Amino acid sequence: MANTVIIVDQSTLEKMKQTYLPFSSPKLPPGAVFAAKKPGVSITGYKSRKVMFQGVNGEAEAKKWVATLPEAKTKAPSVSKGVLPANFAAKNVIGSDEVGTGDFFGPITVCAAYVDAEMMPLLKELGVKDSKAMKDPEICRIAEKIMPIVPHSVLLCPNPKYNELQKRGMNQGQMKALLHNRAIENVLKKLAPIKPEAILIDQFAEKNTYYRYLAKEPSIIREDVFFATKAEGLHLSVAAASIIARYKFVQAFDAMSKEVGIPLPKGAGPHVDVVAAEIIERFGLETLAKYTKQHFANTEKALKIAKK
């Protein structure tokens, strides 16, 4: 089926919505403001001001509207390297963040999430903000409310896979880059034909290093990608991604604790060594490896405790 997509101004979008009202469809896809069906063509208008025409008459129908549009204006100059565009917090953005990288137990968990300007008031009302000071119960409560309404993708690198990749010479930065890139790609596919105005990654490596890590990937997301530390405070999309990632991490943690029969602690401090030693004593080193990042110093410390 042929697809034609045009970008219109807000007034044209409203005019189209009224024009197609007699042909309107009751069900709207995510991000749509109207949907209609005429003989040989389906029309869907999105909040992003993109309008998609599908069907044998799609191109002809689209041309009727293209003829009414003012001339396209040239884009503003690109911003300086490392600087976010003006009014960035109000833009429609995919944000991505990760958790679990500093924890001996548990998987690295990455989430990419899309938040548009219209969704922001609701997300703020639901409690979405920088989650660093939040406790797990609050994280879980908010995540369960926002996951049905926020387009997102969560990817986990389970401990056995993590250990395998690490032994093959891959560092954490490389693993995170792969997960971020794929999670963002997944969200872009979910949103199509809508495109975000920007993508913001909570920075864990320099831009050049990040893309070097992805050099062998068949698909690399580069367009409109920005990197910033403390990105949770710069856009709600990163705050939402962080909350969802942590929720999934907590779920994985709870499942592992249930499986091994011991409450597993987060972090990588001395309290973690004691629990790891208990697992070695009860089940052996191989079992510990199923739930941990083996190259952490905690492994050797736990072995010493277990031998006492």
Curated annotation (Swiss-Prot):
The cellular location(s) given in this protein's UniProt record come to:
Cytoplasm
Biological process GO annotation list? DNA replication, removal of RNA primer; mismatch repair
**Keyword set for this entry?**
Cytoplasm, Endonuclease, Hydrolase, Magnesium, Metal-binding, Nuclease
User: Cofactor binding mode, per the note?
Assistant: Manganese or magnesium. Binds 1 divalent metal ion per monomer in the absence of substrate. May bind a second metal ion after substrate binding.
Keyword Nuclease in the entry? The reply is: yes
- Where the record annotates domain RNase H type-2, the positions are 91-308
Q: Which GO terms describe its cellular component?
A: cytoplasm; ribonuclease H2 complex
Presence of keyword Metal-binding? yes
Q: Enzyme class, one word?
A: hydrolase
Q: Main location per UniProt?
A: cytoplasm
Catalytic activity annotation: Endonucleolytic cleavage to 5'-phosphomonoester
Q: Extract the GO molecular function terms from the UniProt entry.
A: magnesium ion binding; RNA binding; RNA-DNA hybrid ribonuclease activity
**HAMAP family, per the entry:** RNase_HIII (MF_00053)
- Return the protein name: Ribonuclease HIII
Origin species, per record, is: Listeria innocua serovar 6a (strain ATCC BAA-680 / CLIP 11262)
